[in-house]
UniProtKB/Swiss-Prot annotation:
It is a lipid-anchor. This is Foldase protein PrsA 1. GO terms for cellular component: plasma membrane. The lineage of its organism: Bacteria, Bacillati, Bacillota, Bacilli, Bacillales. Residues 1-21 form the signal peptide. A lipid is attached at residue 22 (N-palmitoyl cysteine). The keyword Transport does not apply. It is found in: Cell membrane. It comes from Listeria monocytogenes serotype 4b (strain F2365). It catalyses: [protein]-peptidylproline (omega=180) = [protein]-peptidylproline (omega=0). Its main location: membrane.
Length: 294
C-alpha cells in the first residue's frame, strides 16, 4: 500500500501538534529519570520534522484553494478496501493506522491531485494524441497462483468443463478477488502489470480464457468479462480526458504543482531547525510545470 507511509506522517503530525509547547510534564517515568513532553517533541521533530511540516503546510495552503468532499474520500477509501479485501484491516493495524487516520491522508492526497490537475494544460491536441493509443476499460476475472504447475492443473480443469469462478475461489492467491470468482475492477491501459494487461486486451469474446500469463505477481489465467469497442474521439472525449488526467498524476507533476502553490503562498519559516524543510520545493532545477507533458 503505497500511501501508508504518508498516513504515518499524518499520525505523527497530530502528535507533534499536541506536544508542541506542552513543557516538562513527564510522558514516561523511571527510577533513572523521566522523559518529558518537551524531550519527546524535540526528538520527533528531529526525526520527522521536515516531512511533518511539509504536509501540514501544504494541507493548509491547498485547503484554502481546493475542496475535497467526504464523498470523494469515502470513494477512494472503498478502492483500497476492495483492493486489499480481507487483509485491509490487518494491513492498517500492522502500520499503526486507523480508519480515521487513513482517510485523513487520502483527503490530503486528493488535495494534491486537485492542485496538480489545476496546473495542467489539457489541450485538444494533447487529448487527440492521447486518444490514438487509448483503449476503453476492460473487465476480466483472473486466477493467480504461485507456480506454473498449479496453473496448468487449473487449465486442464477448465478444459474439462469446470467453472472459472469456482476455480478462482478454490485456487487463487489473490484474496481481494478470489471470493468474488476472481473478478477485477475495470481497468485501462497502463494500470496493470504490462504482461497481464497485454494478455487481457488480446482476449476478444466474452468468457474467452487466456493461456498461462507470468507476471511480477505469479502465474495467471484470465477470463474476459466485458470489452467495449473503442468509439470515435467525439464520443469518447470525456473518458479520454479522465484517463489523460490520471496518467499525468505523476510524482514529477505533483511536485511541480506544489512548488507553484508554495511560491504563491509566500512561505516564511520561523523555526531555524526546519529551514530546509522545503528545499526540494524551492529549487529551480526541476520541471516547473506539467504543461510540458505529452
Amino acid at each position: 500500500m503505497t500511501k501508508l507511509k504518508k498516513v504515518m506522517i499524518s499520525v505523527i503530525a497530530a502528535t507533534l501538534l499536541l506536544l508542541a509547547g506542552c513543557g516538562s510534564s513527564a510522558v514516561v517515568k523511571t527510577d533513572a529519570g523521566s522523559v518529558t513532553q518537551d524531550e519527546l517533541y524535540e526528538a520527533m521533530k528531529t526525526t520527522y520534522g521536515n516531512e511533518v511540516v511539509q504536509q501540514l503546510t501544504f494541507k493548509k495552503i491547498l485547503e484554502d484553494k481546493y475542496t475535497v468532499t467526504e464523498k470523494e474520500v469515502n470513494a477512494e477509501y472503498k478502492k483500497y478496501e476492495e483492493q486489499y479485501g480481507d487483509s485491509f484491516e490487518s494491513t492498517l493495524s500492522s502500520n499503526n493506522l486507523t480508519k480515521t487516520s487513513f482517510k485523513e491522508n487520502l483527503e490530503y492526497n486528493l488535495l494534491v491531485q486537485k492542485a496538480t490537475e489545476a496546473n495542467m494544460n489539457v489541450s485538444e491536441s494533447k487529448l487527440k494524441t492521447y486518444y490514438k493509443t487509448w483503449e476503453p476499460d476492460i473487465t476480466v476475472r483472473h486466477i493467480l497462483v504461485d507456480d506454473e504447475a498449479t496453473a496448468k492443473e487449473i487449465q486442464t480443469k477448465l478444459k474439462n468443463g469446470e467453472k472459472f469462478t469456482d476455480l478462482a475461489k478454490e485456487y487463487s492467491t489473490d484474496t481481494a478477488t478470489s471470493t468474488n470468482g476472481g473478478l477485477l475492477d475495470p481497468f485501462g491501459p497502463g494500470e496493470m502489470d504490462e504482461t497481464f494487461e497485454k494478455a487481457a486486451y488480446a482476449l476478444e469474446n466474452k468468457d474467452d480464457v487466456s493461456g498461462i500469463v507470468k507476471s511480477t505477481y505469479g502465474y495467471h489465467l484470465i477470463q474476459l468479462v466485458k470489452k467495449t469497442e473503442k468509439g470515435t474521439y467525439a464520443k469518447e472525449k470525456a473518458n479520454v480526458k479522465a484517463a489523460y488526467i490520471e496518467s499525468q498524476l505523476t510524482t514529477e507533476n505533483m511536485t511541480a504543482a506544489l512548488k507553484k502553490e508554495l511560491k504563491a503562498a509566500n512561505i516564511d519559516i520561523k523555526d531555524s531547525d526546519l529551514k530546509d524543510a522545503f528545499a526540494d520545493y524551492t529549487s529551480t532545477s526541476s520541471t516547473s510545470s506539467t504543461t510540458t507533458s505529452n
